Design a protein with these regions (language model features):
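Membrane-interface junctions at the ends of membrane-embedded or membrane-associated helices
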Residues: 2-14, 173-184, 215-232, 378-383
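Membrane-interface starts of transmembrane alpha-helices
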Residues: 14-21, 99-108, 129-137, 183
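Membrane-interface helix-loop-helix junctions at transmembrane boundaries of multi-pass membrane enzymes
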Residues: 13, 222-235, 322-346, 372-396, ...
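Membrane-interface coil-to-helix junctions
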Residues: 29-120, 127, 139-162, 276-365, ...
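Hydrophobic alpha-helical membrane-interfacial segments at the cytosolic entry of transmembrane helices
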Residues: 19-27, 228-256, 265, 272-275, ...
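Membrane-embedded helix bundles of polyisoprenyl
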Residues: 114-126, 132-221, 233-255
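Alpha-helical transmembrane signal-anchor/signal-peptide segments
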Residues: 38-51, 255-271
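Start-transfer (signal-anchor) and selected internal transmembrane alpha helices
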Residues: 1-35, 232-241, 374
Length: 400
């Protein structure tokens, strides 16, 4: 008995040491990848971030001058509330502090990649992966091209929200594996941070995965005659969700009220006669303008299947990635098959020819990761696998 206890303690110590090693490795990778910019305090030129800073400058200046927080600004749209420009509430100060700790206090944008890795690392541990396997999965997940694309575009709220999705799933997994306290705490905290990151659209899409997982675990529980345990786990998760919503109630309510007066939720009272009978909400073409084309989905494993990116950053400017820069065009020019004038003509056309207006790059997860996904589909058994597979296919369909 004592020998078994010693072995258990030894295993726990090894796992703890492994987790610490993994955290250090992830922090180093994050800093090295963005070296020397993150270390030197250099700032990326991010369109959405720059625009957001400009929009919130008037409100920030008012706070610095008076010590009071304003909920109105004249900096855009002839005046509007600051609910979605610079949402800040006394109730979220603790949440903001937790976010900094979660990013290990690393300089931006290294902290963002670290947050993405640590979140997936926690999820892998919930699935009982060894620490080094969890570390590999975390690195592979975080270095999907999409995350770097949205960092470059300045979609920081979206990125932050996505960093808390994996640990929220981890909490769900632990709850359905009867680790109610651990799962409930992790799920509540991660969901709270997710909502506090203020990109509710991502949380909305994540809800589809939550439902799929709950159904998958229910089917599993029915087969194993453990429906009572499923009910307890679901109850714990429901409480976690309520706590997360309650912690973010001020911002959620303000967003709900404000949405009624926006193009997304309705119409402003200031309308023309032509607008009175217009349908509520966004136009379908507007909503789907940045949707992936069906054949463009192949970029998950073949990055340049639709030509790659439209532009690339170069010395603080965005440069068009034209057809003239392709090896084929240069070979044709060098062989005399096209004239210099024709070559210059190619310089006016982008390499990207997908369905989106433009793109900063393809969403590429990697052939190795995709191969592991297929292997998992074959080797893993049970209803939960099928639920996750259905959710994956649904996400692809929604992306079109």
């Amino acid at each position: 008995m004592n020998q078994e206890k010693k072995q258990t303690n030894l295993l726990k110590n090894k796992n703890l040491i492994g987790a610490i090693v993994a955290i250090v490795v992830m922090a180093v990778i994050s800093l090295v990848y963005f070296y020397p910019d993150a270390i030197n305090g250099n700032v990326l030129q991010q369109h959405d971030s720059t625009q957001g800073i400009a929009n919130g400058q008037e409100a920030k200046a008012f706070t610095e001058a008076t010590g009071e927080v304003t909920r109105w600004t004249n900096s855009l749209f002839s005046g509007m509330p600051t609910f979605q420009i610079s949402p800040s509430y006394e109730s979220t100060k603790l949440v903001s502090w937790i976010g900094k700790v979660y990013g290990l206090g690393l300089p931006a944008p290294a902290n963002l990649i670290f947050m993405m890795m640590i979140g997936f690392f926690i999820l892998m541990l919930a699935f009982k992966a060894r620490w080094y396997v969890a570390l590999f999965g975390a690195i592979a997940y975080a270095f999907s091209t999409y995350f770097f694309i949205i960092i470059g575009a300045g979609h920081i709220w979206k990125f932050a929200t996505l960093t808390y999705v994996p640990p929220t799933i981890a909490g769900i997994v632990w709850c359905y594996r009867k680790k109610y306290a651990l799962g409930g705490i992790v799920a509540a905290l991660a969901a709270t941070m997710q909502l506090a990151s203020n990109h509710f659209q991502m949380t909305y899409y994540f809800a589809f995965l939550i439902v799929a997982m709950a159904i998958g675990y229910l089917v599993k529980a029915i087969k194993e005659k453990t429906v009572k345990d499923w009910g307890i786990g679901t109850g714990v998760l429901a409480v976690a969700a309520i706590l997360a919503v309650a912690a973010n109630a001020p911002n959620l309510y303000s967003t709900y009220e404000y949405s009624k007066e926006t193009m997304r939720g309705g119409h402003s009272e200031i309308t023309t006669n032509a607008d009175v009978n217009a349908p509520k909400g966004l136009d379908k073409s507007y909503i789907t303008a940045w949707s992936y084309g069906i054949d463009e989905t192949a970029s998950l494993i073949v990055p340049n299947v639709k030509g790659g990116a439209t532009i690339r950053p170069e010395r603080g400017q965005n440069k068009l990635m034209s057809l003239a820069e392709t090896k084929t065009a240069q070979d044709l020019l060098n062989s005399g098959k096209i004239s210099g004038e024709e070559y210059q003509y190619l310089a006016q056309f982008p390499q990207y020819f997908g369905d989106q207006p433009m793109t900063n790059g393809p969403v590429y997860v990697g052939v190795v990761v995709f191969a592991l996904f297929l292997l998992g589909c074959i080797t893993v058994k049970g209803a939960v696998k099928w639920a996750l597979l259905v959710a994956t296919l649904l996400s692809l369909l929604m992306g079109w």
